[in-house]
């Protein structure tokens, strides 16, 4: 879950319902959305659920559900779940399940550090954590990699998630990059599944530009064997043309 006031209540209600139905729950506490996908596979769970409204204001909330493979449920599976609520009478469980805490942040931080191919010593980064889940993970990971970190908006009071900060409001991050002479800056949203970056000049680097940077880097390193990048329906034609100019196809 993220840091919203309502997230604890919804998460506890969800856990109670699962346990009452005979299921067992591992409660990860406040974690980025990607961490839940990671732990679903690591723990061999049947499902994972994130309580968050992502980049929306703090008064909103919702659920994101992952399957056993760590991927979001398909539309077909979501429709099937909805039909279950409408069509089936639920039998009483044979036994009540348990809810216990998931030993988490350290292992997830270890995983993220292991993904970095080179240390970040001598680099300075501004991290805007949107007063959300990234605040407990991102600064720690960057510092472990040797970087100097300027951390913004890491409060966890539950009432200021995404409030004039984070990925939808990168202005303070960009200003901090210029003021501190940082090499780059990164803005997350409340559940850390959205990212906006800035370069050393404070210029915004959005998702399309990040996709192009990653794809061209992997191609140059010989790690893009099919010369294919995957975007979304929102990926703009400018990004597609840039990729095509380097012999990379875009699949939406």
Explain the meaning of each model-derived region.
Residues 50, 64, 126, 187, ...:
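Structured core elements
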Residues 61-180:
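Gly/Ser/Thr-enriched, mixed-charge loops and adjacent short helices
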Residues 1-3, 26, 124-127, 227-233:
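Short glycine-rich phosphate-binding loop at a beta-alpha junction
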Residues 19, 28, 79-110, 114, ...:
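Proline/glycine-rich low-complexity loops and linkers
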Residues 2-60, 140-198:
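N-terminal small/polar loop signature for handling phosphorylated ligands or for N-terminal nucleophile
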Residues 7-12, 78, 135-139, 240:
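Short, surface-exposed alpha-helical segments at coil->helix boundaries
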Residues 65-68, 196-200, 244:
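Short beta-strand-to-turn element immediately C-terminal to the catalytic PLP-Schiff-base lysine
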Residues 5, 129, 160-165, 202-206, ...:
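Alpha-helix capping and helix-loop boundary segments enriched in small/acidic/polar residues
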């Amino acid at each position: 879950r993220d840091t919203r006031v309502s997230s604890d209540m919804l998460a506890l209600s969800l856990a109670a319902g699962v346990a009452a139905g005979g299921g067992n729950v591992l409660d990860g506490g406040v974690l980025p959305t990607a961490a839940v996908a990671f732990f679903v596979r690591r723990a061999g769970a049947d499902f994972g659920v994130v309580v968050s409204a992502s980049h929306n204001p703090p008064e909103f909330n919702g659920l994101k559900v992952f399957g056993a493979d760590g991927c979001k449920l398909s539309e077909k599976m979501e429709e099937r779940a909805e039909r279950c609520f409408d069509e089936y009478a639920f039998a009483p469980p044979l036994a009540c399940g348990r809810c216990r805490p998931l030993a988490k942040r350290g292992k997830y931080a270890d995983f993220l550090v292991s993904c970095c191919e080179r240390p970040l010593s001598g680099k300075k980064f501004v991290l805007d954590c949107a007063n959300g889940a990234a605040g407990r993970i991102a600064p720690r990971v960057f510092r472990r990699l040797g970087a100097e970190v300027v951390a913004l908006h890491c409060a966890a009071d539950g009432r200021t998630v995404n409030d004039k900060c984070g990925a939808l409001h990168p202005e303070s991050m960009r200003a901090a990059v210029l003021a501190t002479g940082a090499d780059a800056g990164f803005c997350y949203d409340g559940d850390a599944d959205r990212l906006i970056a800035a370069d050393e000049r404070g210029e915004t680097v959005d998702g399309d530009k990040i996709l192009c940077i990653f794809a061209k880097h992997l191609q140059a390193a010989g790690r893009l064997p099919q010369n294919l990048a995957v975007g979304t329906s929102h990926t703009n034609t400018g990004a597609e043309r840039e990729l095509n100019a380097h012999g990379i196809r875009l699949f939406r």
